[in-house]
């Protein structure tokens, strides 16, 4: 049993301030146990940056969630890395490679904490196809069928 994270971002969703939307959730034993949808505090210059900022925020929450569930005895060990799924290849590359990329030099240093988590083996950032990114409904409206599919993947049951 392990906690798995899903992260997504919608770029430039607010026409007034040009900020993006972050969404992430964590699933344990087939049920969403923690989630968040919020406007980012910075103006991202690209979709990749918005996704990277979201992944960084999710990684901090994910490590707390992992430690919390271990302390409760739900998960036996914190030694295995937590998997966080992201649908943006550029954001995944930024998280995995602790070197400066030409198009990401402007990203604020505080978001590079995810690189440290990956380097230490606390987190593994993996690619998920956008159609299977369970965090999608936390960042944008979806067609009903897709929304219901994601709710089912979250373990949410309609009564």
Model-predicted regions and their roles:
Residues 2, 20, 38-159:
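RNase H-like nuclease module associated with reverse transcription
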Residues 5-48:
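RNase H-like nuclease fold core
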């Amino acid at each position: 049993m392990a906690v798995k994270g899903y992260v997504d971002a919608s770029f430039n969703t607010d026409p007034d301030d040009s900020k993006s939307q972050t969404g992430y959730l964590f699933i344990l034993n087939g049920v969403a146990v923690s989630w968040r949808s919020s406007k980012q505090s910075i103006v991202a210059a690209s979709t990749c940056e918005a996704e990277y900022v979201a992944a960084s925020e999710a990684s901090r929450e994910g490590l707390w969630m992992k430690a919390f569930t271990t302390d409760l005895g739900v998960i036996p060990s914190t030694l295995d890395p937590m998997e966080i799924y992201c649908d943006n290849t550029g954001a995944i590359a930024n998280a995995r490679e602790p070197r400066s990329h030409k198009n990401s030099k402007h990203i604020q240093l505080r978001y590079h904490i995810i690189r440290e988590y990956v380097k230490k083996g606390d987190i593994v950032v993996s690619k998920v196809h956008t159609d299977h990114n369970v965090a999608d409904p936390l960042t944008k409206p979806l067609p009903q069928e897709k929304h219901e599919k994601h709710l089912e993947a979250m373990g949410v049951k309609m009564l």
